[in-house]
């Protein structure tokens, strides 16, 4: 059941980039607003809002900012016209890429995403062109030092899909999309405190890259992540550790 995550280096790199660019607040303000609009402003009855709230608090966002974002979503602070969009395409070396956005201007966002693909040697595709290569999953991460055997037993009892040990000592518990909140709550009840928890798009197949290919694909991912309207970028790029070390 346990294994090594091929995409851990991409995830950790993305986290560094998010923090570096200061996009964290903008990202979670949008997520709070959309989650509240879709499921209401009470995090106790809105799991998506609860997750966004936890993320925002973890990023040291003030309660005042959080409350205003939720109020916009529920209409208590005026209307909000932000919509969720997903773009799909192929990057260099045939790497499949999915781009999740939140925007108040579809045309602006589509043009910016299309430009990034074109500039970096990729092609923006149509809906469904690469989505079949990904599965929406829950990912619950525990820091180094957690009792792996006990965590694995608790995860199996909670009907988790997989438990993965990473090279940095952390452990990821993967769940179905529908079972994410149930597994997360069960593990918390069993005494395990997660370092992170999120809904992700995991590739079902991977495209292994050499150094040149990795540099091209990461250039595209960087350009996409720099766009103001982009929330998340997922790919099926598999960058071996030997190549990742050369990237720095």
UniProtKB/Swiss-Prot annotation:
InterPro entries: Integrase-like_N, TACO1_YebC-like_2nd/3rd_dom, TACO1_YebC_N, Transcrip_reg_TACO1-like, Transcrip_reg_TACO1-like_dom3, YebC-like. This is Probable transcriptional regulatory protein PFL_4766. GO terms for molecular function: DNA binding. The keyword Magnesium does not apply. One of its GO terms (biological process) is regulation of DNA-templated transcription. Its main location: cytoplasm. Pfam families: TACO1_YebC_N (PF20772), Transcrip_reg (PF01709). It is found in: Cytoplasm. GO terms for cellular component: cytosol. Keywords: Cytoplasm, DNA-binding, Transcription, Transcription regulation. Signal peptide: none annotated. NCBIfam families: PRK00110.1, PRK12378.1, YebC/PmpR family DNA-binding transcriptional regulator. It comes from Pseudomonas fluorescens (strain ATCC BAA-477 / NRRL B-23932 / Pf-5). Belongs to the TACO1 family.
